[in-house]
Amino acid sequence: MAAERGAGQQQSQEMMEVDRRVESEESGDEEGKKQNSGMVADLSAHSLKDGEERGDEDPEEGQELPVDMETISLDRDAEDVDLNHYRIGKIEGFEVLKKVKTLCLRQNLIKCIENLEGLQSLRELDLYDNQIRRIENLDALTELEVLDISFNLLRNIEGIDKLTRLKKLFLVNNKINKIENISSLHQLQMLELGSNRIRAIENIDTLTNLESLFLGKNKITKLQNLDALTNLTVLSMQSNRLTKIEGLQSLVNLRELYLSHNGIEVIEGLDNNNKLTMLDIASNRIKKIENVSHLTELQEFWMNDNLLDCWSDLDELKGARSLETVYLERNPLQRDPQYRRKIMLALPSVRQIDATFVRF
């Protein structure tokens, strides 16, 4: 069922996923950039990729007619059931699937989550791209580890507090305005909430096993309430309303940080994030590379579409011996006819400048 859409998803500089599915409202060349680097983050194959095409349109206005479930043959002994794009309008008749572990119902016409109580062995449930307005009737699925209800019409996070074995939760591109009702999900490792209407990071302090958090393309104004997430390795906050890098001091295991398309003016607040290998601060209002000389494990540094105009700032990156990819295009620096040559001289380990590989 392609449960791993994640971290690397298209939440790139667009986003998101990731990620793995994560997320893509930016320009096409930005997407290409992510793919070239092999770090299609944050936003997930689900994040943002179809968002602009679909927008907030109510799928009920579509012209597809639901299919009769009696015309669909189900294998009683199947462990993996994929009914992607079958025009299913109602969940029914699945009680015969006593052994099913993964059930994919993406891209159908489902309006209500129902009639799944008998699927006690279910580990993964995919309801991506339907017409669901409410999370309900899932309490009996206590073995569930992966739940995807992205690209639906949800306004609230609810009805999942009993799913205590859940490890991955994807609710991308809905109409959710608040993070809530997930405090019991102690085993959660990946949370994907890109492309919603969330205004604050809150109610996640009990998610101490969380490794990846995708919140790209929301309305968040401040990095906060992250102190308990000491196992977090990926944080994606592209396309929000941030003006300051802060609140990351406890994220000592953070390896990938995506902050593009915000209103940040200064690089700061990264003193304890020594393990960072990926830093994306593209499309902000930053004039200077500073406070990153201690990030010696950096492999990728994306700072295109900012206000950088001083070549000596690149000295801040010289300690990153493994730095292979830098994006500095569409900064004032790029006007220099020796732009690429000067980057190569300042950062000899770099193998890719913007979207082009270095030729030796």
UniProtKB/Swiss-Prot annotation:
Swiss-Prot/TrEMBL LRR repeat ranges: 77-98, 99-120, 121-142, 143-164, 165-186, 187-208, 209-230, 231-252, 253-274, 275-296, 297-318
Subcellular location: Nucleus
Basic and acidic residues composition bias: residue spans: 17-34
Residue stretches of biased makeup (Acidic residues): 53-63
Record region (Disordered): 1-65
Tissue-level expression: Expressed in epididymal spermatozoa including the principal piece of the flagellum and the head-neck junction.
Function per UniProt: Regulatory subunit of protein phosphatase 1. Inactivates the PPP1CC isoform 2 during epididymal sperm maturation.
Record family assignment: Belongs to the SDS22 family.
Name this protein carries in UniProt: Protein phosphatase 1 regulatory subunit 7
